[in-house]
Swiss-Prot record:
Keywords: 2Fe-2S, Amino-acid biosynthesis, Branched-chain amino acid biosynthesis, Iron, Iron-sulfur, Lyase, Magnesium, Metal-binding. Homodimer. Binds 1 [2Fe-2S] cluster per subunit. This cluster acts as a Lewis acid cofactor. The active site is at 517 (proton acceptor). Mg(2+) binds at residues 81, 123-124, 491. Pfam families: ILV_EDD_C, ILVD_EDD_N. This is Dihydroxy-acid dehydratase. It comes from Pseudoalteromonas atlantica (strain T6c / ATCC BAA-1087). SUPFAM superfamilies: IlvD/EDD N-terminal domain-like, LeuD/IlvD-like. Functions in the biosynthesis of branched-chain amino acids. Catalyzes the dehydration of (2R,3R)-2,3-dihydroxy-3-methylpentanoate (2,3-dihydroxy-3-methylvalerate) into 2-oxo-3-methylpentanoate (2-oxo-3-methylvalerate) and of (2R)-2,3-dihydroxy-3-methylbutanoate (2,3-dihydroxyisovalerate) into 2-oxo-3-methylbutanoate (2-oxoisovalerate), the penultimate precursor to L-isoleucine and L-valine, respectively. The modification N6-carboxylysine is found at residue 124. Its EC number is 4.2.1.9.
Length: 615
């Protein structure tokens, strides 16, 4: 029978000092011997997805205490990728994931906590907490802050839905006047919550459901809706139950490495492909797998991407549907139900509710008339009122969206496309693979040949695009922006947004060893591995080279012979500063240099290179 980890600090005369300190936090005699549960919150006023989380930790804590546990809350950092975008702040985004993971590990292990409730929401916070949970392997439940409502504005006498990317595009589109741009900007992000499309934050919160580590509705229930309060309360109650099962009944099935096992990672990736999630999710799933010693690799993702259809199309891939529409259609469990009916899901994987994922799907599938509670739950919708407050409205759609032929979520027979929304490409510039979000690529450019335009920083590429130096048929190559080369693997949302604003969204491609925002669409290929700074082939492409992208064949490369490529490699190796940008002025802080020293390329999740830390 496993002993409570917290007993190390609460039991025995020699721990009198520790108990004295625990008492100073509010603990009483009767609390020593109860499970001490860490509530890892991520409240900050910098991030709309986290601005409403201040009271959520205490909401969970009171629920934990009512169920018989002791709750202790702490906070992690949280970076807003949208605000950090387009300047040197973006260098810090991905490295913050490792700091979040480390901070959770530090707090939980330093104080010998018995379990964790992770209150996350935006881009690097959920992945960082997931990585920590897989490292620690103690009972955990995730509960996110939820997505924001879609923005809405009236243009040409029509009400249209908006998100952050619409504001960015309008800001540089010469066809949009100042008044229209200002209206879009003021309307794009109307409430607290993670940005309203299937961007990185919402994608990751959806994936925690598929991994079995969060409750039904976690990925799709709006931040503003009153029903979301129930998820926080239930998380507090259920984590105490998981502690009871593990510490009192020796039930190891409740541990995250047993719930989020290899099959669960396949389920999560299948969901990601089916819903056309952010390419960043691949990076984060691979990182979590490494931390949990789960043998899930890019090869598995490549295999799944060839078999899983695209069942749910959401902004930025279409303006028609946002997360509130996904929720109305049955949320994550609605998509998983269609995957299950298509024979593309492992329905026997465990879940934090103590059931299999298949059982949870059956209970929450809105296409089954007997699930009246699910139909009511998934009718929760937006109020259309600007607010930063959680649980501030209780509006409901008249009906749920159960249309699997033409609705937001489709059956396999009515899929948006037979192949899913993400693909892995290989070739001489990405020997270990690269990623494209096919859900956002027009079919007319699934095969594309163009002229390489080489830029060794995102800033230089942006200047060239805005100066109209990039023309139709060009392939913009941005390199030395990987985890090590950036350092920090910046998101390239501004270059792709500006290409779209210039009318080049279907006429150009962008290839990088950096990454993309979940808001990116178009022929945008990232995560080229190995990255240029690690000797990757992307570092050998020259200005004016012909390059070819072939999504159906999963191929990408520069159109030169192996002999020419090898000659370029030898020349690079013999240069004064091999595998470094030739003319880039960028001040890199000591903190970022420390990150770069251990960073692996994207195909390994950009985690630390453990081989460099071996005894």
């Amino acid at each position: 029978m496993p002993k409570l980890r917290s007993a190390t600090t609460t039991q025995g005369r020699n721990m009198a000092g520790a108990r004295a300190l625990w008492r100073a936090t509010g603990m009483k005699d009767g609390d020593f011997g109860k499970p001490i549960i860490a509530v890892s919150n991520s409240f900050t006023q910098f991030v709309p997805g986290h601005v409403h989380l201040k009271d959520m930790g205490q909401l969970v804590a009171r629920s934990i205490e009512a169920a018989g546990g002791v709750a202790k809350e702490f906070n992690t950092i949280a970076v807003d990728d949208g605000i950090a975008m387009g300047h040197s702040g973006m260098l810090y985004s991905l490295p913050s994931r490792e700091i979040i993971a480390d901070s959770v590990e530090y707090m939980v292990n330093a104080h010998c906590a018995d379990a964790i409730v992770c209150i996350s929401n935006c881009d690097k916070i959920t992945p960082g907490m997931l990585m920590a949970s897989m490292r620690l392997n103690i009972p955990v439940i995730f509960v996110s802050g939820g997505p924001m409502e879609a923005g809405k504005t009236k243009l040409s006498d029509q009400i249209i839905k908006l998100d952050l990317v619409d504001a960015m595009v309008a800001g540089v589109d010469n066809n949009v006047n100042d008044e229209q741009s200002g209206e879009i900007e003021r309307s794009a992000c109307p409430t607290c919550g993670s940005c309203s499309g299937m961007f990185t934050a919402n994608s990751m919160n959806c994936l925690t459901e598929a991994l079995g580590l969060s409750l039904p509705g976690n990925g799709s229930m709006l931040a503003t809706h009153a029903d979301r309060e129930g998820l926080f309360k239930q998380a507090g109650t259920q984590i105490v139950e998981l502690c009871r099962r593990y510490y009192q009944q020796d039930d190891e099935s409740v541990l995250p490495r047993n719930i989020a096992n290899f099959k669960a990672f396949e389920n999560a990736m299948s969901l990601d492909i089916a819903m056309g999630g952010s390419t960043n999710t691949i990076l984060h799933l691979l990182a979590a797998a490494v931390e949990g010693e789960v043998p899930f690799t890019l090869d598995d993702i490549d295999r799944l991407s060839r078999n899983v259809p695209h069942l749910c199309k959401v902004a930025p891939s279409t303006p028609q549907y946002h997360m509130e529409d996904v929720h109305r259609a049955g949320g994550v469990l609605g998509i998983l139900a269609e995957l299950n009916r298509a024979g593309l899901l492992h329905e026997d994987t465990p879940h934090v509710l103590g059931k299999s994922i298949g059982e949870v799907i059956s209970e929450w599938d809105i296409t089954q008339p007997e699930n009246a509670h699910a139909l009511e739950f998934f009718r929760a919708g937006p109020a259309g009122i600007r607010t930063t407050k959680a649980f501030s409205q209780d509006c409901r759609y008249p009906t749920a969206d159960t249309d699997r032929e033409n609705g937001c979520i489709r059956s396999r027979a009515n899929a948006f496309s037979e192949e899913g929304g993400l693909a892995v490409l290989f070739g001489n510039i990405a020997q270990d693979g690269c990623i494209v979000k096919t859900a956002g690529v027009d079919e007319s450019i699934h095969v594309f040949t163009g002229r390489a335009r080489i830029y060794e920083s995102q800033d230089d590429a942006v200047k060239a695009i805005l100066a109209d130096e990039v023309i139709a048929g060009d392939i913009v190559v941005i390199r030395y922006e990987g985890p090590k080369g950036g350092p920090g693997m910046q998101e390239m949302l501004y270059p792709t947004t500006y290409l779209k604003a210039k009318g080049l969204g279907k006429k150009c491609a962008l290839i990088t060893d950096g990454r993309f925002s979940g808001g990116t669409s178009g022929l945008s290929i990232g995560h080229c591995s190995p990255e240029a700074a690690s000797g990757g082939g992307i570092g050998l492409v020259e200005e004016g080279d012909s390059m070819t992208i072939d999504i159906p064949q999963r191929k990408i490369g520069v159109d030169i012979s192996d002999e020419v490529l090898q000659a370029r490699r030898e020349k690079m190796e013999q240069s004064a500063n091999p595998w470094k940008p030739v003319s880039r002025e960028r001040k890199v802080s000591l903190a970022l240099k420390a990150y770069a020293l251990l960073a692996t390329s994207a195909d390994k999740g950009a985690v630390r290179d453990a081989s460099k830390l071996e005894d």
